[in-house]
């Protein structure tokens, strides 16, 4: 099944994507991100991450560099938004 999903993404990237104007606001592109996520985490987790990325790929989000995470999580982790609590003296 993994090969079928990866071949489908390849087909999209080679035959469909070039016929449409570039729209992805992220690096790597959503198709590259999904391909890498499927390779790294398997079909279901990879497609889940790809879907989560795809729904964020719109003008309401900033975009930019957004690599496949090192570890899989069902929850969204915002990078660089970790808060450190200070002790009050």
UniProtKB/Swiss-Prot annotation:
Which HAMAP family does the UniProt entry name for this protein?
A: UPF0161_YidD (MF_00386)
Q: Which GO terms describe its cellular component?
A: plasma membrane
Q: Does the keyword tRNA processing apply?
A: no
Q: How does it sit in the membrane?
A: Peripheral membrane protein
UniProt-recorded name of the protein: Putative membrane protein insertion efficiency factor
- Family, similarity comment: Belongs to the UPF0161 family.
UniProt subcellular location: Cell inner membrane
Q: Which source organism?
A: Petrotoga mobilis (strain DSM 10674 / SJ95)
Keywords of this protein's UniProt record, alphabetized?
Cell inner membrane, Cell membrane, Membrane
**Known function:** Could be involved in insertion of integral membrane proteins into the membrane.
